Design a protein with these regions (language model features):
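Non-catalytic, solvent-exposed interaction/assembly segments
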Residues: 1-117, 141, 275-279
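Short glycine-rich phosphate-binding loop at a beta-alpha junction
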Residues: 75-86, 170-171, 251-263
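Active-site neighborhood for divalent-cation/phosphate handling
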Residues: 78-187, 288-289
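Glycine-rich phosphate-binding loops at beta-strand->alpha-helix junctions
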Residues: 254-278
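Glycine-rich phosphate-binding/hydrolytic loop that grips phosphoryl groups
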Residues: 179-185, 283-315
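Phosphate/oxyanion-binding active-site loops and adjacent basic polyanion-contact surfaces
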Residues: 56-63, 232-236, 298-305
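ATP/nucleotide-binding catalytic cores
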Residues: 57, 199-203, 269-274
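Small-residue (GG/TT-enriched) beta-loop-alpha framework at ligand/catalytic clefts
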Residues: 2-3, 7-40, 75, 137-253
Length: 315
C-alpha cells in the first residue's frame, strides 16, 4: 500500500467502451502536472455495465483488475469519478436564498424526486452545490443549485470498483463541471480586453450518443445542458443557441469557444464561428497540466473531463 499524498490527485472518466484515468502531482506549490494517463477499453459498454441500476455485475471483476493495474499504486487519497449527463441525473434548480437550510434540503429532495421519478430519494446517492447566486425580477436573491444523483446501486458498485485501489474514498462529478475547471485554468493565464467585455465561455462536448454544453462566466461554472438529438454541427449549434437563450445569455456575450469529446473535427464547427464570431478551439488539458512522462495525450479532447475532475483537489 503506497503512502497517501495530498499533493497527488487521481480521476477516471467513463464513456462508451473507454475508461480513461489520470494522475496529477504538484511539487513545491507549483501547478499540478500530469504524472500518468491512459485509456482502458473493454468489449462492452461501460455505462451499461457500471452506471445503470440493473448493470452487468459480471463485468465488474474485469474492470476492477484492469483499473488496479493502471492505478493500483497511486498515493492519491481520493478518486474523482467523472460521468456524462446521460449516465446520471444532472440538473439545476433555483432555491430562494432566504429559505432556511433545512427547508432547502427538503426542496432539493422534492425536486430530485420530480426529475428522477424515483419513489424515494433514499434510492439515490445525491450531491449538490450552489453554483451561483442572483436575483429574481423583484430583486429577491436566489441560488442556482446543481444536483448530481446516481442510483444507490450504482454508487455501491462504484465503491466495489474503487475497493481495488489505494484511495478508499471517491466523489462523483459531471463532465460539464469538470471541463469548466480546465477552461478556468486556461483563461487564468490572461485574456484580451475584448474578452473581458464578453465574459462567457461556451464548451461543447461531442459524443456519439449526445452533445454536452458547459457555460462559464468569468472562469466560474455557470450552467450546463445536454441534448441527445444534436448529432450534426448545425444541430449542435441550434441547441447551443437555445440553451443560451434559456439561461438569458446573449450570443455576443460569449468570448471563447472550446470543443472536447471524441472524433473531433474542429473544422466542422464552422456554424458556431458564424453565430458567435469566435473560432472554436480544441479543449486540450495538456495546456494546463503538461504532456506527462509518456508524451502528449493521444486524444486530448477526450481527456478533458478526466483531467478536470482530477483538478478538483487543486482549486
Amino acid at each position: 500500500m503506497p503512502t497517501m499524498d495530498d499533493s497527488v490527485s487521481a480521476a477516471l472518466s467513463i464513456q462508451g467502451d473507454a475508461l480513461r484515468f489520470v494522475e496529477l502531482r504538484r511539487q513545491d506549490g507549483d501547478e499540478p502536472r500530469l504524472a500518468r494517463a491512459g485509456t482502458l477499453r473493454f468489449p462492452f459498454d461501460l455505462g451499461e455495465a457500471l452506471l445503470r441500476e440493473d448493470g452487468t455485475s459480471s463485468h465488474l471483476r474485469r474492470v476492477r483488475e484492469a483499473l488496479a493495474d493502471a492505478l493500483g499504486d497511486t498515493p492519491a487519497r481520493t478518486l474523482q469519478v467523472a460521468i456524462h449527463p446521460p449516465d446520471g441525473y444532472s440538473f439545476f434548480t433555483p432555491i430562494s436564498s432566504d429559505v432556511p437550510v433545512r427547508d432547502r434540503k427538503r426542496q432539493l429532495l422534492q425536486q430530485t424526486a420530480l426529475v428522477t421519478g424515483v419513489r424515494s430519494t433514499k434510492e439515490l446517492h445525491l450531491t449538490s452545490e450552489t453554483v451561483r447566486t442572483t436575483q429574481d425580477s423583484e430583486g429577491e436573491p436566489f441560488m442556482w443549485v446543481h444536483v448530481l444523483a446516481v442510483p444507490d446501486a450504482v454508487d455501491r458498485r462504484m465503491g466495489d470498483l474503487v475497493g481495488a485501489l489505494p484511495p478508499r474514498e471517491y466523489t462523483w462529478i459531471v463532465s460539464s463541471e469538470a471541463v469548466s475547471r480546465v477552461t478556468a485554468r486556461i483563461e487564468r493565464a490572461g485574456g484580451s480586453a475584448e474578452e473581458a467585455l464578453r465574459p462567457y465561455t461556451l464548451v461543447v462536448g461531442q459524443y456519439p450518443t449526445h452533445t454536452e454544453y458547459a457555460l462559464s462566466r468569468n472562469r466560474d461554472w455557470y450552467h450546463a445542458h445536454y441534448a441527445e438529438e444534436a448529432r450534426s454541427p448545425e444541430n449542435r449549434a441550434y441547441f447551443a443557441v437555445g440553451f443560451l437563450n434559456r439561461v438569458g445569455v446573449p450570443l455576443d456575450g460569449v468570448g471563447r469557444l472550446f470543443v472536447y469529446g471524441v472524433d473531433l473535427d474542429v473544422g466542422a464547427y464552422a456554424p458556431f464561428e458564424q453565430i458567435f464570431g469566435q473560432a472554436p478551439e480544441v479543449l486540450d488539458p495538456v495546456r494546463v497540466v503538461g504532456a506527462g512522462p509518456e508524451g502528449p495525450l493521444d486524444a486530448p479532447g477526450a481527456f478533458a473531463p478526466c483531467v478536470g475532475a482530477a483538478m478538483g483537489n487543486y482549486l
